[in-house]
Curated annotation (Swiss-Prot):
Cell inner membrane listed as a keyword: no
Native source species: Porphyra purpurea
Assigned keywords, A-Z: Chloroplast, Plastid
Major site of localization recorded for this protein: plastid
InterPro entries: PRibTrfase_dom, PRTase-like
Keyword ATP-binding part of the UniProt annotation: no
Entry's Gene Ontology cellular component terms: chloroplast
One Pfam family hit: UPRTase
Family affiliation: Belongs to the UPRTase family.
Record's protein name: Uracil phosphoribosyltransferase homolog
Superkingdom as given in the UniProt entry: Eukaryota
Subcellular compartments: Plastid, Chloroplast
Amino acid sequence: MQLQINVASHPLIQHWSGILENNNNPGTILRTACSELGKWITYEIMREWLVTETVSIKDNTTISLISNHYKYIIVIIMPYGFILAEGARALLPTANIALVSYNNSIDNISDKLDSFTKILVLDLFLDEIIMTSVLEELIKKGAILNNIKIACLECGSSQLNKLGQKWSTLEIYTTKVNSITDNSEATKEQVLKDKFFA
């Protein structure tokens, strides 16, 4: 596995991740935690990813603004990725939104992506089968792998190994990597999902 795995360490990310660890919290609190994590993980990504340009204004003063030569797309793996997107949209309000439906196809996205398209893929818990399908479709449409970032709350090392075999330069941002994927982890994931939609 040669993936670049970024386990976010921002204090607010650690705080909201801690909230998620307590399954006794009500669903509304857990949803708020996920929304906040979506925002702060996106912030960590955008720090190194946004392209800026210097613009001259009056009196020979220059300022830095986000370059309008690039377009940003948020790809949401439904239904749970939408919870992260609530926070991510706050930092990328002009980004186009594309949805991954139940058959893993991407809706509302151009068939002609290019090197000036930056794509953020959001899912609550990383699923390598769904993610592989999404990546294959994005690249088929012209996306550049180096312009794609994945954000999720948790992922398993076995899933990362499988993705790394095919997408060795892929970058993934998460709050936690589980070294062992077992029934207890699956139960925790289902508890969260059940509470979100209770």
